[in-house]
């Protein structure tokens, strides 16, 4: 299913070669942060579904830091980050009130 991407031509200029090197590093860093973001959100959702109030609150606090970092770096849009935080906050609060 995963098709190989066509190989790009190597840049001639030194600045172009440097840009390619930088892009590889930046892409790896962004991929890692994107994954960390999604994992943090999933952890909160799992805790909410399990009905564990203390774990959900703890995971939500950790998730907020990750979400803010990713939004500040521009990997995800700040509105998406705010939307995710708002929705998860509502779920955690509903869990706290229900218990």
Curated annotation (Swiss-Prot):
Entry GO terms, CC: cytosol; small ribosomal subunit
Compositional bias per record (Basic residues), positions renumbered to this chain: 1-20
Transmembrane segments: none
Ranges for region Disordered: 1-21
Molecular function GO terms recorded: small ribosomal subunit rRNA binding; structural constituent of ribosome
Domain of life where this protein originates: Bacteria
InterPro entries: Ribosomal_bS20, Ribosomal_bS20_sf
GO biological process annotation, one example: translation
Assigned keywords, A-Z: Ribonucleoprotein, Ribosomal protein, RNA-binding, rRNA-binding
HAMAP family in the record: Ribosomal_bS20
Entry similarity comment: Belongs to the bacterial ribosomal protein bS20 family.
Function: Binds directly to 16S ribosomal RNA.
Protein name per Swiss-Prot or TrEMBL: Small ribosomal subunit protein bS20
Natural source organism: Verminephrobacter eiseniae (strain EF01-2)
Gene: rpsT
């Amino acid at each position: 299913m995963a098709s190989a991407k066509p190989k790009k031509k190597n840049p001639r200029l030194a600045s172009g070669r440097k840009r390619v090197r930088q892009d590889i590093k930046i892409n790896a860093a962004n991929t890692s942060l994107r994954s960390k973001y999604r994992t943090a959100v999933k952890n909160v959702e799992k805790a909410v579904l399990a009905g564990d109030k203390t774990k959900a609150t703890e995971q939500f606090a950790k998730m907020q830091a990750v979400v803010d970092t990713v939004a500040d770096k521009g990997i995800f849009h700040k509105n998406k980050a705010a939307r995710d935080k708002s929705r998860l906050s509502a779920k955690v609060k509903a869990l706290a009130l229900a218990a």
